[in-house]
Amino acid sequence: MNNNGFSTGEEDSRGPADQVCCLLDDGDRCRNQAGNASYSKRIQKTVTQRRLKLSIDTAARHIYICDFHKGRIQCARTKRRRRDSEDDSNETDTDLPEVDLYQLQVNTLRRYKRFYKVSTRPGINKAQLSETIMKHFKTIPIKEKEILTYFIYMVKSNSNKLDQKNNTSNEAT
């Protein structure tokens, strides 16, 4: 019920809770309960780019999606496109951990790009930027033994810059 533009709360409780997900999953209508996530143009673009077999049901009177599809879309956003082709090949990256650069802030990704002079096209979005940086990140050669030796030396000699900053700030107070 609506009183002079104010809600009594009754219609709010009948929102997505009694609605079914508005998506067609590979042509079949999803029967899960709709959550509070909506199928926006941005999400639709992600679904198209990642080639997920999801589309909105034109018969649905809302754009709310279930938690299952929300999670699936979010998961697809962070995965790299070429994962399937890498799984088919005989390459094994079992010893290399997968780093999810999408979790970093855009400014951090841009600083990395600027520092390593990684070239990208202008107007690139966060997902594309993190994917480009991930490709570059994997090409950086590292000498594990040398890095570990240096790390242990720095810890034992108390030469860590962060420790020095903490000590000077403690002495000043």
Curated annotation (Swiss-Prot):
One of its GO terms (biological process) is regulation of DNA-templated transcription. This is Histone deacetylase complex subunit SAP30 homolog. Component of the class 1 Sin3-histone deacetylase complex (HDAC). GO terms for cellular component: histone deacetylase complex. A zinc finger (Atypical) spans 21-69. Keywords: DNA-binding, Metal-binding, Nucleus, Repressor, Transcription, Transcription regulation, Zinc, Zinc-finger. It is found in: Nucleus. Required for the function of the class 1 Sin3-histone deacetylase complex (HDAC). Belongs to the SAP30 family. InterPro entries: His_deAcase_SAP30/SAP30L, SAP30_C_sf, SAP30_Sin3-bd, SAP30_zn-finger. One of its GO terms (molecular function) is transcription coregulator activity.
